[in-house]
Each structure stands twice: as structure tokens, then as C-alpha cells.
From Swiss-Prot:
Gene: mdcB
Family: Belongs to the CitG/MdcB family.
UniProtKB keywords: ATP-binding, Nucleotide-binding, Transferase
Protein name: Probable 2-(5''-triphosphoribosyl)-3'-dephosphocoenzyme-A synthase
GO biological process, one term: prosthetic group biosynthetic process
Pfam families the UniProt entry points to: CitG (PF01874)
HAMAP family documented for this protein: MdcB (MF_01883)
Function statement: Involved in the formation of 2-(5''-phosphoribosyl)-3'-dephosphocoenzyme-A, the prosthetic group of the acyl-carrier protein of the malonate decarboxylase.
Enzyme class (EC, first level): transferase
InterPro entries from the UniProt entry: CitG, TriPribosyl-deP-CoA_syn
Superkingdom to which the source organism belongs: Bacteria
EC number, as in UniProt: 2.4.2.52
Methyltransferase is among the record's keywords: no
């Protein structure tokens, strides 16, 4: 008798959770990232390290699976689904904070990847843009139970500078991902940059266009302007696969460290980019089915 035991195939919700967690791990591992935690060190952070980022990502698997499964059960964008996703996201955040001893590692990623996981379940076979549009429809619905914290870093920055934050990025269909990160990832691959360089280029494309509230909080408008200009300079020099681009990347890293600023918003959206990029080829069956 065979010692092998047949294992039940993972559900669509479990596959989506796998993809979401893997996207977070891949983002954390990507190196060298200016100002961000990576395999070399903690970047501009004093309270984060790579092992903590990995543990945080793994802790979010149940929340992502539950959000995708809730979308499967509801079957459409609705107020009820929005409120369920909100509660599941808060539960996931509580578990993340338990695992990290109170350090906010992935709050923004829970928002972005939670919405996209649910939207991917609703939009079987859809393009990245179609999934992002469904996520936007969910994000535009109000969640009455969501805590209102006008003194959060993000809320204060948005008021002070009149910029859009993570909520509005989702409500507009993740333009930093759909219009910048994903096209750059695909273009750099086609140019033969290699996978790690293509992912770095995607991050830089997001950084060059995003009003990253994490950077605004730490370094103000001057810091944001320097980050965006530095990211554009890398891409204009040929990207991370070129010697000139790598020199520009080192210069940008020096600037981010001197500013003590980390583009955490861009990192979350790179994870969203990697999630959408891998969604179709990684699925062994149509998303939304068992």
C-alpha cells in the first residue's frame, strides 16, 4: 500500500492567500531597496528587520483567505461584503500586531491586498485592471465600523499637504500599480533586465509617481520631491540593470537614509503589483471556483 496520502487541493481562497503572502515576502526580500527593509538591513527603520517582515506576512494568511472566502460567499460587490472585509482586516491587523509586538509592519498592505484578494475572487479571469476596478468599487463603500483616527500619521499628512492617501489610491483603482508599477515590471522583463531588476524598476516607477505619505510624514514635501526625482533618475539612466542606473540607485539610497525616510506606501503597492502579476499564471484553476 502506498505511503503517499492524497492531499485535498487548496481552495481558490487559499490560493489567493498564498499569493498575497508570497507577494509580501517577495517585496521584503527584494534588494537593494532605497530606505526599505531588505536582505541587507533595516533601511531607514529602527524597529523593523527582515525576519519580522516575514513573520508579519505569514501571520496575515488567515485574514487574506477569509477575505477571499467572504467574497466567494457574497458573490458581488456589496455593502455587506465591504463591512465583512473591514472586520476581517481589523482582525488581521490585531494578529499582525500580536506577532510583531506592536510594530506596524503591514497595515497598508492589509488594506491593498485584502481588497485585491476579494476582488480577484469576484472577477474570475479578469485582467489586472478589471480586478483593480472591482477593488475600487469595494473601497468606495463606507465601513461604519472603521475606526476614525484624525490624528494618525496618514490622516495628518493628507490634511496638511492636501494629498491622497492609501484609501484614495484604492478608491481610484490603484493607479500607481496599474499605470506605473505593472507596466514597468513588464517592460523591464521584455528588455531582459532580469526578474530582480525588473521588480526594482517597478518599485521605482511607483516611487516616481506616488505621493507616499510615509515619506511625507518623515521628510515633508522636499523629501517627497527628492524621492520622486531620484527614482525617475534611475529609470531614465537605464534602470537597475544598467551600470548608470545602479549608480543612481545608490545615490537615491543615500538620500533616503539621510532623510530617515522609507517609502512604505510604495512598498505596499509593489506587493500589490507582484500579486496581480502572479495571479493568473499561479492559479491552477479559475479563481472563484473549487
Amino acid at each position: 500500500m502506498s505511503a503517499l496520502i492524497a492531499r485535498q487541493a487548496p481552495s481558490a481562497a487559499e490560493r489567493l492567500a498564498d499569493l498575497a503572502v508570497q507577494a509580501l515576502v517577495d517585496e521584503a526580500d527584494l534588494s537593494p531597496k532605497p530606505g526599505l527593509v531588505d536582505r541587507r538591513g533595516s533601511g531607514a527603520h529602527s524597529d523593523l528587520h527582515l525576519g519580522l517582515m516575514h513573520a508579519s506576512a505569514q501571520s496575515l494568511w488567515p485574514a487574506f483567505a477569509a477575505m477571499a472566502d467572504a467574497a466567494r460567499s457574497e458573490g458581488r460587490v456589496s455593502q455587506a461584503l465591504r463591512e465583512t472585509l473591514g472586520q476581517l482586516g481589523r482582525d488581521g491587523e490585531a494578529e499582525m500586531l500580536r506577532v510583531t509586538a506592536g510594530v506596524n509592519t503591514h497595515r497598508g498592505a492589509i488594506w491593498a491586498l485584502g481588497l485585491l484578494s476579494a476582488a480577484a475572487m469576484l472577477e474570475s479571469g479578469a485582467s489586472a485592471g478589471g480586478i483593480a476596478a472591482s477593488a475600487a468599487a469595494l473601497a468606495r463603500l463606507d465601513d461604519p465600523a472603521a475606526p476614525h483616527n484624525p490624528d494618525s500619521h496618514g490622516a495628518r499628512v493628507c490634511r496638511r499637504y492636501g494629498v491622497l492617501g492609501a484609501r484614495e489610491q484604492a478608491q481610484h483603482g490603484f493607479p500607481a500599480v496599474i499605470e506605473h508599477g505593472l507596466p514597468q515590471l513588464l517592460a523591464s522583463r521584455r528588455a531582459g533586465a532580469g526578474e530582480q531588476n525588473a521588480r526594482l524598476d517597478a518599485l521605482l516607477a511607483i516611487m516616481s509617481s506616488l505621493t507616499d505619505t510615509c515619506v511625507l510624514h518623515r521628510a515633508g514635501l522636499e523629501g517627497l520631491t527628492r524621492m520622486q526625482a531620484g527614482a525617475r533618475a534611475v529609470l531614465e539612466a537605464g534602470g537597475c540593470a544598467s551600470l548608470a542606473g545602479r549608480r543612481r540607485l545608490r545615490a537615491l539610497e543615500g538620500e533616503m537614509l539621510s532623510l530617515r525616510a522609507s517609502p512604505g506606501g510604495a512598498a505596499d503597492l509593489l506587493a500589490a503589483t507582484l500579486f496581480l502579476d502572479r495571479l493568473t499564471p499561479a492559479a491552477s484553476a479559475p479563481i472563484g471556483s473549487y
